Amino acid sequence: MKDINEGKITKEDALELLTCLWIKTLTINKVRSQSHTLSSAGSPMYQNVTIGGQTTDKKDAVNELSFVVLQSVAQTRLTQPNLTVRYHANIDKHFFDECIEVMKLGFGMPALNNDEIIIPSFINWGVKEEDAYNYSAIGCVETAVPGKWGYRCTGMSYINFPRVLLCAMNDGVDLTSGKRFTKGYGKFTEMETYEDLLAAWDKTVREMTRYSVIVENAIDKASERDVPDVLCSALTDDCIGRGKTIKEGGAVYDFISGLQVGIANMADSLAAIKKLVYEEKKITKEQLWNAILDDFQSEENKKIQEMLINDVPKYGNDDDYVDQLVVEAYDSYLDEIKKYPNTRYHRGPIGGIRYGGTSSISANVGQGMGTIATPDGRNAFEPLAEGSSPAHNADKNGPTAVFKTVAKLPTEKITGGVLLNQKMTPQMLSTEENKQKLEMLIRTFFNRLHGYHVQYNIVSRETLIDAQKHPEKHKDLIVRVAGYSAFSVSYTHLTLPTIL
């Protein structure tokens, strides 16, 4: 913008430079293992550009460059880099209108993060105010202070909530592998009350969280020794001043968020067990357990599956019955993860600790492939729910109900990101009136409900179905996954159906 103001380049020149940069960014890729590919469908590289936001005196930070960046991303319509807009209550109205217009183009950008929840959360963790107001998105939905953050802001392992629940119900033995995962706290068929089950969950998820930290710390130490990242360290404050690489504790801040998969499946499973088994006694513990092991295949077990799916409140519908159950169960994990510092703790950075985060990327597909049937009626090896979004086909009361459910999560503790995917058809935004309704819906989610994040897939179901059948006809179709956009033809055959 300085060069434009000084007459060295025109606005059109700046727009061309940015579009060339985005095209160059798209050429970066890397070869991944099969397991990594399942967790990162579409070959994302996680570059993220952030615009919008506010200054420390709460003035809107939108400027002419914000519009140019938005225009350049809309013009190229590529999958990289990601574009994130920092929303706040006083965001420029014209700029926000333009953001909605770009969303309507249907390539999943921009995503929206909420300053009103993220900035206070950072400050509570010890981030200086001026740095908290300068945060940006990194990767998918994670947030960090640019140029001052540790070498990773998110976890290297996933806690598969539904699989942990099944393990808790089976005295610590994993039903997929047959291996003992934890000490064991009883069998479901012998648990007399819902509170007994919840106690087993609490102990099991804490134990699994501890194991995940042990694994991550081992990886961190090996990475510190073998991959020092000298160039990255030279560009990060205060590595040179401390004489340490970013992996030795040279950064100003160093926080890591844990990752979880299947939050909604866990919620719906707990609701099904509590309501149908313990309260209404429509299903015995033995019947439910046998139905799970049978993958709901027999005629009798198919009827049980129908009850689990249709006769129980579901996460995503603003029903306190199930929403409060997930908050209670989730708190066990959030309370445990914060106990474990990372390997840079007390080596220089502010922080050096862990907090929650729900960025599952596309691991809900791979993790689902290793998880047998679950008490919510999901069949064995099907994908799990991603991020903080409802399970597939579970939300029946519209987007407002989904927003109200997600807002009940302890967002202030989940600083690593509360990822929410929403879907709309292009026809729903075909009129100015409907566009304004979407804008008001987002404002309500952020201003009144204090949501963390939302992103949209605006593409018709018919287009997605045809892309499945005839991918060669849709090579330019871009859809949003858990925190990033990718060409539909780059997804595995398992990932695209989860977007449907």
What are these regions (language model features)?
Residues 1-494, 500:
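Conserved catalytic cores of very large enzyme subunits
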